[in-house]
């Protein structure tokens, strides 16, 4: 017959093992759910890719390679000479700290 201390150790170990197993199952379920959601978002993103995104270079009015970004050939010519003080680097330099 086992002593009382041995029983506590056995049942405590089984309880902790059960909790660990439960945690692994819950984390696996969350990971599977997240994986399915990412796949669904990727599919919806691929279907919506017909709309062109703004390319960083187009936002800075820089030349954009023809394979990337929107076609800017027909844009308004007024906005090409912007105030250079509006550039992020200039704002960061002039910002009082």
From Swiss-Prot:
Stretches the record annotates as Disordered: 59-97
GO cellular component terms, semicolon-separated: cytoplasm; cytosol; Golgi apparatus; Golgi membrane; membrane; plasma membrane
One GO BP annotation of this record: dendrite development
Main location class: membrane
Protein's UniProt name: Leukocyte-specific transcript 1 protein
Chain positions with Phosphoserine modification: 58
Biased composition range(s): Basic and acidic residues: 70-86
Annotated function: Possible role in modulating immune responses. Induces morphological changes including production of filopodia and microspikes when overexpressed in a variety of cell types and may be involved in dendritic cell maturation. Isoform 1 and isoform 2 have an inhibitory effect on lymphocyte proliferation.
InterPro entries, per database record: Leukocyte-sp_tscrpt_1_LST1
Family assignment from sequence similarity: Belongs to the LST1 family.
Keyword Phosphoprotein: yes
Membrane-spanning residues: 8-28
Alphabetical list of Pfam families matching this protein: LST1
Induction of expression: By IFNG/IFN-gamma. Up-regulated upon autoimmune and bacterially-induced inflammation.
Protein keywords: Cell shape, Golgi apparatus, Immunity, Membrane, Phosphoprotein, Transmembrane, Transmembrane helix
Subcellular location: Membrane; Golgi apparatus membrane; Endomembrane system
Tissue and organ expression note: Expressed in lung, tonsil, thymus, placenta, kidney, fetal spleen, fetal liver and brain.
Membrane topology type: Single-pass membrane protein
Top-rank lineage group of the source organism: Eukaryota
């Amino acid at each position: 017959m086992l002593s009382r201390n041995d029983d506590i150790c056995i049942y405590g170990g089984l309880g902790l093992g059960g909790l660990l197993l439960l945690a692994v199952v819950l984390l696996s379920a969350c990971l599977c759910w997240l994986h399915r959601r990412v796949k669904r978002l990727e599919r919806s993103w691929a279907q919506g890719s017909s709309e062109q995104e703004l390319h960083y270079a187009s936002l800075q009015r820089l030349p954009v390679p023809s394979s990337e970004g929107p076609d800017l050939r027909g844009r308004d010519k007024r906005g090409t000479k912007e105030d250079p003080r509006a550039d992020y680097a200039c704002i960061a330099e002039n910002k009082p700290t």
